[in-house]
From Swiss-Prot:
Keywords: Dioxygenase, Disulfide bond, EGF-like domain, Endoplasmic reticulum, Fatty acid biosynthesis, Fatty acid metabolism, Glycoprotein, Heme, Iron, Lipid biosynthesis, Lipid metabolism, Membrane, Metal-binding, Microsome, Oxidoreductase, Peroxidase, Prostaglandin biosynthesis, Prostaglandin metabolism, Signal. This is Prostaglandin G/H synthase 1. The conversion of arachidonate to prostaglandin H2 is a 2 step reaction: a cyclooxygenase (COX) reaction which converts arachidonate to prostaglandin G2 (PGG2) and a peroxidase reaction in which PGG2 is reduced to prostaglandin H2 (PGH2). The cyclooxygenase reaction occurs in a hydrophobic channel in the core of the enzyme. The peroxidase reaction occurs at a heme-containing active site located near the protein surface. The nonsteroidal anti-inflammatory drugs (NSAIDs) binding site corresponds to the cyclooxygenase active site. Pfam families: An_peroxidase (PF03098). It comes from Bos taurus (Bovine). The active site is at 207 (proton acceptor), 385 (for cyclooxygenase activity). Its EC number is 1.14.99.1. Disulfide bonds join 36-47, 37-159, 41-57, 59-69, 569-575. Its main location: membrane.
Length: 600
């Protein structure tokens, strides 16, 4: 039979196969056990329960068939056979700099970037599927944006153990778990050279779409934009936005202190900000995100973006003197969204990845691909992004070290030092390694405790189920996970089975890639969420990605040429050392601040 004949008949043979049978649960299980507690359906097959002890796997469009979606179709088999492992791909991308220097200078870079974007983004379901209240496809899951979506349905409530059927009947105490495995003994710097400028950017950037609703519960969000909408700059609702706006020339309100532009006080912009009692209103700065008064590092970025917005408005006003306040404001917002995405992909994600492949923000790479320009934030992404090991033991500004007690809610540091000095200090101080465990400062360990408790309330499936969902092999032992024996033995004692390990502890305790900030799972799970959210923004669509959207070539070029250095140095009187990477110790250290060039 010819090869063409096989390719034509193979799909027909699949059609003749009977649908997946309704199967009984494991015969050795005590009845009645929900059969879906065993997670029998593989390769993204959907488990549907029938009666008390029967189930059926829906293998539609998974590329697999059979009772548990385990038999590959021929093209699936070829694809999986030829696909390199994630660890091998990571090795290739982080070795052979001379080869990647050549690739980055050729058309191959665009080809690889398109492949990265499509392969990663295809792992995220669109439209969204489940949420905290619905473990099945429903109109509510699709239409109600008050929910976080979720990638995997929750652990069924009637399972024998909290994680399904594996492990112990009671999970280890969250506080004990955090103190034993996550609490810092000694600060472990990130071997990739990540700094506090990166750490504060991560917090500032993600708090526009990670805004869990305290009233509704951990499955709900107040960030209804579900992506890069800059709600942390402009507010997450129209009322807050109006309080922050100047309503003149498209600009935001501001105050002048020591001859510099800073966010207005809550007296001038009466919005809710979370400050401790006793801090007078005139000392509370008003910005889009109500929690940014917590850290001077967050308020540094809030100040920089405020200055950038008003600077862009001046440029647009010069180009379009007939435009009114509203059009100037809205166009400036789109430009800042574009600048944010450009900086995130080409500098922030680049620093995280450690890749020699130079990442590129070019929405046109996806114009020929099937891609949906909308996004929904997943609760797993929210859980994953608690990167508190980045925070140091103390914060060094100039010659002085500030403790957490001195740094948190410090309302005078920003104005006393100025943006340039703080940017320079944060760019020079190393951040901590995220993966590998035992690197969260005791002042913020309670956050990890709360994350673990929240994941139990949300009934997230085990860590290994998420590894399978994102195309990785499940770990077979705790020692394989951690890469060492002592911690592995303790985890075995607490959980009883590697298949019962929880999602967040698994991410933070996984052994890191060599000279990397974290391990395989954080990269393979985090990258799809990030890239889908960034490129799924409407400004990246063919309808929006054109000069007219951004007020002409001047605005479009602001987006296309944005960098972290430009963002800072075009909004300060002097140009500090600014980077997501600590200075190279082999180079002669430059002065703390420089005068910015006229062209950056």
């Amino acid at each position: 039979m010819s090869r063409q004949g096989i390719s034509l008949r193979f799909p027909l043979l699949l059609l003749l196969l009977s649908p997946s049978p309704v199967l009984p649960a494991d015969p050795g299980a005590p009845a009645p056990v929900n059969p879906c507690c065993y997670y029998p359906c593989q390769h993204q097959g959907i488990c549907v329960r029938f009666g008390l002890d029967r189930y059926q796997c829906d293998c539609t469009r998974t590329g697999y068939y059979g009772p548990n979606c385990t038999i590959p179709e021929i093209w699936t088999w070829l694809r999986t056979t030829l696909r390199p492992s994630p660890s091998f791909v990571h090795f290739l991308l982080t070795h052979g700099r001379w080869l990647w220097d050549f690739v980055n200078a050729t058309f191959i870079r665009d080809k690889l970037m398109r492949l990265v974007l499509t392969v990663r983004s295809n792992l995220i379901p669109s439209p969204p599927t489940y949420n905290v209240a619905h473990d099945y496809i429903s109109w509510e899951s699709f239409s109600n944006v008050s929910y976080y979506t979720r990638i995997l349905p929750s652990v069924p409530r009637d399972c024998p153990t909290p994680m399904g059927t594996k492990g112990k009947k009671q999970l280890p105490d969250a506080e004990f778990l955090s103190r034993r495995f996550l609490l810092r003994r000694k600060f472990i710097p990130d071997p990739q050279g990540t700094n506090l400028m990166f750490a504060f950017f991560a917090q500032h950037f993600t708090h526009q779409f990670f805004k869990t609703s305290g009233k509704m519960g951990p499955g709900f969000t107040k960030a209804l934009g579900h992506g890069v909408d800059l709600g942390h700059i402009y507010g997450d609702n129209l009322e807050r936005q109006y309080q922050l706006r100047l309503f003149k020339d498209g600009k935001l309100k501001y105050q002048m202190l020591n001859g510099e532009v800073y966010p207005p006080s809550v007296e001038e912009a009466p919005v809710l900000m979370h400050y401790p009692r006793g801090i007078p209103p005139q000392s509370q700065m008003a910005v889009g995100q109500e929690v940014f008064g917590l850290l001077p590092g967050l308020m540094v970025y809030a100040t920089i973006w405020l200055r950038e917005h008003n600077r862009v408005c001046d440029l647009l006003k010069a180009e379009h003197p007939t435009w009114g306040d509203e059009q100037l404001f809205q166009t400036a917002r789109l430009i800042l969204i574009g600048e944010t995405i450009k900086i995130v992909i080409e500098e922030y994600v680049q620093q995280l990845s450690g890749y020699f492949l130079q990442l590129k923000f070019d929405p046109e790479l996806l114009f020929g691909a099937q891609f949906q320009y909308r996004n929904r934030i997943a609760m797993e992404f929210n859980q994953l992004y608690h990167w508190h090991p980045l925070m140091p033991d103390s914060f060094r500004v100039g010659p002085q070290d500030y403790s957490y007690e001195q740094f948190l809610f410090n309302t005078s540091m920003l104005v006393d030092y100025g943006v340039e000095a703080l940017v320079d200090a944060f760019s020079r101080q190393p951040a901590g390694r995220i993966g590998g465990g035992r690197n969260i400062d005791h002042h913020i360990l309670h956050v990890a405790v709360d994350v673990i408790k929240e994941s139990r309330e949300l009934r997230l499936q085990p860590f290994n189920e998420y590894r399978k969902r994102f195309g990785m092999k499940p770990y077979t032992s705790f020692q394989e996970l951690t890469g060492e024996k002592e911690m592995a033995a303790e985890l075995e004692e607490l959980y009883g089975d590697i298949d019962a390990l929880e999602f967040y502890p698994g991410l933070l305790l996984e052994k890191c890639h060599p000279n990397s900030i974290f391990g395989e799972s954080m990269i393979e799970m985090g990258a799809p969420f990030s890239l889908k959210g960034l490129l799924g923004n409407p400004i990246c669509s063919p309808e929006y990605w054109k000069a007219s959207t951004f007020g002409g070539d001047v605005g479009f070029n602001l987006v296309k040429t944005a960098t972290l250095k430009k963002l800072v140095c075009l909004n300060t009187k002097t140009c500090p050392y600014v980077s997501f990477h600590v200075p190279d110790p082999h180079r002669e250290d430059r002065p703390g601040v420089e005068r910015p060039p006229t062209e950056l």
